[in-house]
UniProtKB/Swiss-Prot annotation:
Record keywords: Activator, DNA-binding, Transcription, Transcription regulation
Protein name: DNA-binding protein Fis
Organism: Aeromonas hydrophila subsp. hydrophila (strain ATCC 7966 / DSM 30187 / BCRC 13018 / CCUG 14551 / JCM 1027 / KCTC 2358 / NCIMB 9240 / NCTC 8049)
Known role: Activates ribosomal RNA transcription. Plays a direct role in upstream activation of rRNA promoters.
SUPFAM superfamilies the record matches: Homeodomain-like
Pfam families: HTH_8
Lineage per the UniProt record: Bacteria, Pseudomonadati, Pseudomonadota, Gammaproteobacteria, Aeromonadales
Length: 98
């Protein structure tokens, strides 16, 4: 569904610029455009569980990139994400990344 990639530079820029101007949101803009494209391709078909679908499309690659960046260090990855380690472990298990 989402065919756009997030570079590590973009992730770092996005992370460090929480107070960035509204026009400087490459990740948000990419997700928004991908959603528009997806909905346009539906041709009026009903969508069920869109929230869960979008979340998994964003969350799984994010977890993959962060786990690579931290070289598998779950504690460091959890701190980076602002979640506790147990939550991270559940998410990794959900996507078969444990």
């Amino acid at each position: 569904m989402f065919e756009q990639t997030l570079t590590s530079d973009a992730l770092v820029t996005t992370t460090h610029n929480h107070a960035a101007e509204p026009t400087q949101r490459p990740l948000r803009d990419s997700v928004q455009q991908a959603l528009r494209n997806y909905l346009a391709q539906l041709n009026g078909q009903e969508v069920i569980d869109l929230y869960d679908m979008v979340l998994s499309e964003v969350e799984a690659p994010m977890l993959d990139v962060i786990m690579q960046y931290t070289r598998g260090n779950q504690t460091r990855a959890a701190v980076m994400m602002g979640i506790n380690r147990g939550t991270l472990r559940k998410k990794l298990k959900r996507y078969g990344m444990n």
